[in-house]
Regions:
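Conserved ABC ATPase "signature" region
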Residues: 20, 25-35, 92-93, 130, ...
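Conserved ABC ATPase "signature" C-loop
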Residues: 243-244
Length: 285
């Protein structure tokens, strides 16, 4: 099957500081994170990121704290502005969008699921799930019907009139996923979406996401620091260190052929046979 690139990151750099453009040549010449901070009092967020994210696939961006993974995902909808580089969505450079077009892209093309759930406590589960449609100005009846459908799909049928504080963490995150799906966006950005959950609930949420993805074929960009989660979810895995891509590719390939000592340390404790067997079972016939 022919793949279609949905999101492209090309030569993407992010330097945090008051004069990022002036220190960019130093970074491009090879200056590292520590030297940049010591010498110029700027912080290196991303260095020369080149990633192609395919339509209908889950791209997982993984790394330790401070690796740049959350910085990366916030560039896709321009919550963070890059220092240099291109961000293409469906072939359109996001950096060239007007304020109006950027707002339209955020409303219609991308949805986001956060680690801390980001639910409005004074709104019911139904109202939270329907939020994207409310912002779009759809009739209330249409909003509620669509939100009810997705709440039922994520296992929250009957909880429409509850408030977030009445739900467990796992249930609150199901509301977050229902809200993202209700928006009917092509692209879902999931920033450490399951990291705050207990292990068993986390596994359930991973299974739910994979189950929905079989049918919906969304383009999902998923951020995590957990290798087991990354290997379970990823069609394409991108591993970051100090703001740069260390290795990327199909998860099994990275697992069997790590190209860097940093990656070798990550995968050393993984049961390769179990992971390969699980991913083989998950492949459609």
């Amino acid at each position: 099957m022919t793949q279609t690139t949905k999101v492209s990151l090309r030569g993407l750099y992010k330097i945090f500081g008051n004069d990022d453009k002036s220190v960019l040549p130093h970074v491009k010449a090879g200056m590292g994170k520590e030297e940049l901070l010591t010498t110029h009092k700027h912080v290196l967020g991303l260095r020369d990121i080149n990633v192609e994210m395919q339509s209908g696939e889950i791209t997982v961006v993984m790394g330790l704290s401070g690796s740049g993974k959350s910085t990366l995902i916030r560039h896709l909808n321009r919550l963070i502005e890059p220092t240099d580089g291109e961000i293409l969505v469906d072939g359109v450079d996001v950096m060239n969008l007007s304020t109006t077009d950027l707002r339209q892209m955020r409303q219609n093309k991308m949805s986001m699921v956060f680690q801390k759930f980001a639910l409005l406590p004074h709104r019911t589960v139904l109202q939270n799930a329907a939020m994207a449609l409310d912002i779009k100005g759809l009739p209330t009846e249409e909003q509620e019907q669509e939100a009810k459908n997705w709440l039922a799909r994520v296992g929250l049928g009957g909880f429409e009139n509850h408030y977030p504080a009445q739900l467990s963490g796992g249930m609150q995150q199901r509301v977050g996923i229902a809200r993202a799906l209700t928006s009917n966006s092509d692209i879902m950005l999931m920033d450490e979406a399951f990291s705050a959950l207990d292990p068993l609930i986390r596994t359930d949420m991973q299974d739910l996401l994979l189950e929905l993805q079989v049918e919906l074929k969304k383009t999902i960009i998923f951020i995590t620091h957990d290798l087991d989660e990354a290997l379970k979810l990823a069609d394409h895995l991108v591993i970051l260190k100090d703001g740069a891509v260390v290795q990327q590719g199909e998860p099994q390939g990275i697992l069997m052929n790590p190209t860097d000592p940093y990656i070798e340390d990550f995968v050393s404790d993984i049961n390769r046979a179990r992971v390969l067997r699980v991913r083989s079972v998950m492949q459609p016939l």
